[in-house]
């Protein structure tokens, strides 16, 4: 059918977008985005069941969330190689540019035509927000990155609590956990015990405490996904 062909074409384009991000940023590997997507779906499914959502809605959202989570860092295609591939610490200016990957990614979905576009935009812009309002980019205009609300220092005011879209809060947990337990050029992988202790510690500050409880409920599934998509490092 035409609808099926269109869906397959959309999926193919999205997979190419994911590949583009991977070519630009050495950290955005295939295994990493697959793990983040897998963890996100597990957290969402358990949260949805806990909250008695209908199976039909869960299935539809799950498929959209998987692709949106894979594209969480797609805005990095707008960041220069000098910053993306810098081995040392960022200067304040470089960090400011790096943070723009959130709204730059959200801009790709600005003419929202589907539930997927809405979800992908939410994930791109909000996966670095913190539950306590200390994350980024905060309340900014998606087109320009300019602040819509500013804090006392003139910086954009961070989104906090349930101002952060649910799917951004979920992908944040998946992304941070994967970063902790993964080896990178500049750091060794943490042990699972240390990473889990850190995740628990950040409930209520970095993360939504309810979703951290859900994360621990699905830990066996998280381990299975982690084993399935091992990194080459």
Question: Would you name each region that the model predicts?
Answer:
Residues 2-13:
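Amphipathic coiled-coil signal-transmission "stalk" helices
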Residues 19-233:
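Metal-dependent catalytic cores of enzymes that make or break cyclic nucleotides
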């Amino acid at each position: 059918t035409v609808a099926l062909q269109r869906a397959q074409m959309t999926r193919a384009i999205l997979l190419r977008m994911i590949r583009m991000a991977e070519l630009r940023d050495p950290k955005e590997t295939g295994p990493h985005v697959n793990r983040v997507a897998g963890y996100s779906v597990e957290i969402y499914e358990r949260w949805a069941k806990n909250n008695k959502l209908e199976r039909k809605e869960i299935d539809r959202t799950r498929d959209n969330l998987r692709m949106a989570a894979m594209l969480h860092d797609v805005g990095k295609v707008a960041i220069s190689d000098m910053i993306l591939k810098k081995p040392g610490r960022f200067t304040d200016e470089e960090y400011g540019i790096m943070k723009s990957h959130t709204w730059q990614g959200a801009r790709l979905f600005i003419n929202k035509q589907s539930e997927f576009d809405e979800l992908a935009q939410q994930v791109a812009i909000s996966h670095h927000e913190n539950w306590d309002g200390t994350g980024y980019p905060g309340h900014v205009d998606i087109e320009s990155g300019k602040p819509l609300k500013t804090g006392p220092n003139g910086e954009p005011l961070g989104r906090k609590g349930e101002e952060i879209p649910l799917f951004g809060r979920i992908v944040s947990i998946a992304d941070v956990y994967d970063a902790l337990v993964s080896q990178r050029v500049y750091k060794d992988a943490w042990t699972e015990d240390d990473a889990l202790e850190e995740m628990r510690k950040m409930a209520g500050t970095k993360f939504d405490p309810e979703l951290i409880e859900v994360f621990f409920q699905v830990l066996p599934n998280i381990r299975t996904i982690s084993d399935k998509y091992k990194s080459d490092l």
